[in-house]
A protein has these predicted regions:
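Conserved, charged catalytic cores of large soluble enzymes
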Residues: 4-107, 181-206
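Function-dense linear segments that define catalytic or interfacial modules
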Residues: 1, 5, 89-176, 181-191
């Protein structure tokens, strides 16, 4: 569904998949995106070659962010061979990524693709949005915008049509929203600041 349904008619869903580092299939996932090692039958090309000619050429786990989940076992000195191979793969292909979940958060392995939200509940949902700081003139306006945007996200979460009953139950239980901040560089440029923290920005954010 995520590969084909367009959000708002213009944006494809972001996909995320992860696996525990101790899973029996972990070595297969580690190398799943080595497309240069996967030949196309009847040709001398690999899938990576085909992707260079046609970005939309189908490839395993294409359009999905993948990660390995590391927990207390890794933290206590185990799974070093897997971790080092993960580092090697990430340097070669950019994936898999790394997900670290320790102690009382060890089961929070579920994420949305950009990982603003973490959860341990199957079928969890979240409603995300961003405030463009560059379009706001005063700290008072910023406060009002954050307040209204948070309300908007809550209302959207409540009103959203959900695919099945379990999602609705988890939504009522957790009610997750995430309000991000963008446009900070433009905000700084408009005020002739360098791209760094300053007292004015600190005052706005506090």
């Amino acid at each position: 569904i995520g590969r084909n349904v367009m959000q708002g008619g213009s944006r494809r869903s972001a996909l995320y998949g992860s696996m525990d580092a101790g899973h029996g299939d972990i070595w297969e996932l580690l190398h799943a995106k080595n497309w240069s090692d996967i030949p196309i039958e009847g040709t001398e090309l690999s899938i990576a070659d085909a992707k260079k000619f046609n970005f939309n050429y189908h490839a395993p786990l294409d359009m999905m962010n993948i990660s390995l989940n590391y927990g207390d076992e890794w933290l206590n000195g185990g799974q070093d061979d897997i971790f080092m191979e993960n580092c090697k793969q990430a340097l070669m292909t950019g994936e898999p990524g790394f997900s670290f979940n320790f102690g009382d958060k060890k089961n929070e392995t579920l994420r949305n693709a950009c990982t603003e939200i973490t959860s341990e509940d199957d079928s969890d949902v979240c409603n995300l949005g961003s405030v463009n700081l560059a379009n706001i003139e005063t700290p008072e306006d910023f406060k009002d915008v954050v307040h209204l945007a948070s309300k908007f996200l809550v209302c959207g979460l409540i009103r959203a049509h959900l695919p099945y009953e379990k999602v609705e139950k988890i939504r009522q239980q957790n009610s997750r929203i995430g309000l991000g901040l963008m446009g900070m560089h433009e905000w700084l440029l408009k005020r002739s600041y360098k791209y760094e923290m300053n007292r004015d920005l600190m005052r706005w954010l506090n």
